[in-house]
């Protein structure tokens, strides 16, 4: 609460930057946006109607330029994917890939993920949640901005169907350690390993990660399931 009794603003885990939108991305936003982009609305989505079928649904938060999400969706046509991203160049890049690959099992929401989870996705509806390489906010004074905090993890777990999973990945060891502590403290979840897991096939290697591996950088994956 603030001094005047109002609600304290939520600290967001991202900063909106005016990134350059390429010509191909801009064209994809105009031509493919109406098909693939779902406008934010404070009411629950009917996912069966959105995808015109009944299938497992996986949410990916912060898909970046969309390379990994497009690859995963192409490899798993039996699963529907909902990608949430706030940055316009990334949304345009993913739409371009969806068009080129003729993928119909992805929808995009360009909005704050916490608000999407709270208002648009019903409890116990998701088969999985992916959050790969969220901003590490590596300076200690910025750790409060990190996405993976107890309130969000509780919200994420509530949107998973029983047996559904949360898969996190980071290349910052201290963030991986924080993730492990936070997820293990959530009563709705259980770890699928003693601590971290080898990279599952459901997380494709991106060019960024391949470069990091060549430079000797570590990557930590965590997979927890809803009890």
Curated annotation (Swiss-Prot):
Pfam families: Methyltransf_4. Gene3D superfamilies: Vaccinia Virus protein VP39 (3.40.50.150). The keyword Cytoplasm does not apply. Its EC number is 2.1.1.33. InterPro entries: SAM-dependent_MTases_sf (IPR029063), tRNA_(Gua-N-7)_MeTrfase_Trmb (IPR003358), tRNA_methyltr_TrmB_bact (IPR055361). Keywords: Methyltransferase, S-adenosyl-L-methionine, Transferase, tRNA processing. It catalyses: guanosine(46) in tRNA + S-adenosyl-L-methionine = N(7)-methylguanosine(46) in tRNA + S-adenosyl-L-homocysteine. GO terms for cellular component: tRNA methyltransferase complex. S-adenosyl-L-methionine binds at residues 60, 85, 112, 135. It comes from the Bacteria. Catalyzes the formation of N(7)-methylguanine at position 46 (m7G46) in tRNA. Belongs to the class I-like SAM-binding methyltransferase superfamily. TrmB family. This is tRNA (guanine-N(7)-)-methyltransferase. It comes from Thiobacillus denitrificans (strain ATCC 25259 / T1).
């Amino acid at each position: 609460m603030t001094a005047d009794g109002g609600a304290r603003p939520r600290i967001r885990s991202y900063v909106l930057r005016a990134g350059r939108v390429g010509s191909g991305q801009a064209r994809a936003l105009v031509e493919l946006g109406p098909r693939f982009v779902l406008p934010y609305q404070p009411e629950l989505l009917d996912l069966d109607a959105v995808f015109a079928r009944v299938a497992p649904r996986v949410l990916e938060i912060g898909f970046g330029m969309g390379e990994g999400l497009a690859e995963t969706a192409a490899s798993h046509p039996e699963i529907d994917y909902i990608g949430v991203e706030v940055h316009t160049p990334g949304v345009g890049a993913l739409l371009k890939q969806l068009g080129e690959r003729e993928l119909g099992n992805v929808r995009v929401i360009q909005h704050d993920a916490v608000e999407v989870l709270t208002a648009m996705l019903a409890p116990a509806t998701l088969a999985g949640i992916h959050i790969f390489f969220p901003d590490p906010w590596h300076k200690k004074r910025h750790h409060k901005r990190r996405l993976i905090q107890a309130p969000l993890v509780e919200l994420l777990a509530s949107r998973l169907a029983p047996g559904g999973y949360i898969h996190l990945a980071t290349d910052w060891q201290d963030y991986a350690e924080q993730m492990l502590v936070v997820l293990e403290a959530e009563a709705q979840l259980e770890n699928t390993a003693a601590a971290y897991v080898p990279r599952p096939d459901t997380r494709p290697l991106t060019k960024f990660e391949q470069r990091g591996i060549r430079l000797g950088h570590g990557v930590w994956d965590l997979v927890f399931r809803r009890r």
